[in-house]
Every structure is written in structure tokens, then in C-alpha cells.
Amino acid sequence: MVKMAESLFTIFLEGVFIKNFLLIQFLGLCSFVGVTKDLKSASGMSGAVVFVMAMAATVSFALYNFILVPLKLEFLRTIAFIVVIAALVQLVEFIVRKHVPALYRSLGIYLPLITTNCAVLGAVLLNVMNDYDLAQSVVFGVAAGLGYTVAMLMMAAIRERSDLVEVPKSVGRGVTYAFFIATIMSMSFVNFFGVIPLE
């Protein structure tokens, strides 16, 4: 039991910090740059991604292990996972549109783009490639979503704060500036690589 808890904690740390999808693996950068102009939009998008990643990890585990593997259809996993993610995103979009219309409008095109967010698909595929069981898959899905949230909120806070100061013209305020900030954030996260040995 203790070994299992240690394993889950290690997977959690990997998902949030060591294998952070945005700052270490550079997956899902479209929303990272596009939605982090203010904290409200970034937190809404992050919540949606955490939900989709956690649910996709759970549903995809069941789909892969109880349907695709017994029927020897493992080669369809990517397509099957994309369909699962798309269905979950439609559910999230429906809920957000109905209950938080202001957030729905502020997220714009980025909410449906969670379907094509490679970070979500990457998390699900890593669960299969690492041969995680259900608990490990769910923990990794939640941790990857929380890692995404940490990076999104840090970026949004920095960008909001930088609106109050003068930025050199050579750096600018658009995408160039966002990637400049992301580079510095990424370098700080690289230091986490020494915490847990990667296989």
C-alpha cells in the first residue's frame, strides 16, 4: 500500500512539474499563448483542461483495456482517444455556455480547440505507453492538468503584471513577449529534472 502511494505521488510530481506539458514538453502552446492575457480566462481554460484530462484518462483507460485490446484493435487508439476527447470537450463547452456565458465568450475559439490540444492527447497516450493502471492513469491525468494550470496561471499573472510596466519595443507585447516569458519559465522548470530519475 505504501509503495502504491509512493508510486502515485511520483506520478503526480512528474505530471505537475517534471514532465510539465507546457513548459517541458511544449505541448498545447496555442492556448498557452492565446488565453493567458488575463487570469480569469486562463483559470477558466485551465479548469476545463483539468476536467477533460482527468475524464479522458479514465474513459480512455477503460476503452483501451476493455474494448480495443481484447478486440486486437490497438492500432485505433489514437482515433478512439480523439473521439473521447472531442465528446468530453463538447460536454464542457455545453456546461460553460449554459452556466458561465461570460467565460464562454472570453475563451472564444480556444474552448473547442481543447479537442485538438496535443497536451490532452499526449497525456492519454502517455498513460498507454507507460502501461499505467486505472489509478495511475487518473492521477497522471489530473496531475498533467494541474501542471497545465500552474503554467497557465503563472503566465497570465506575469502578463497582467507586465501590462503595468514599460516593456522595451524590441520585445513587444504580443506573441514574441509571451514566448520570451515562456522561455524563462521553462528554464526554471528544467531544474526539476533532477528530482526524479527519468527512465
UniProtKB/Swiss-Prot annotation:
Annotated membrane topology: Multi-pass membrane protein
A cellular component term, taken from the record's GO annotations: plasma membrane
Key words of the record: Cell membrane, Electron transport, Membrane, Translocase, Transmembrane, Transmembrane helix, Transport
Subcellular location: Cell membrane
EC primary class: translocase
Function: Part of a membrane-bound complex that couples electron transfer with translocation of ions across the membrane. Catalyzes Na(+) transport, most probably coupled to electron transfer from reduced ferredoxin to methanophenazine and heterodisulfide reductase. Involved in heterodisulfide reduction during methanogenesis from acetate.
Assembly information from the UniProt record: The Rnf complex is probably composed of eight subunits, including RnfA, RnfB, RnfC, RnfD, RnfE and RnfG.
Name of the protein in its database record: Ion-translocating oxidoreductase complex subunit A
Species of provenance: Methanosarcina acetivorans (strain ATCC 35395 / DSM 2834 / JCM 12185 / C2A)
Classification of source organism: Archaea, Methanobacteriati, Methanobacteriota, Stenosarchaea group, Methanomicrobia
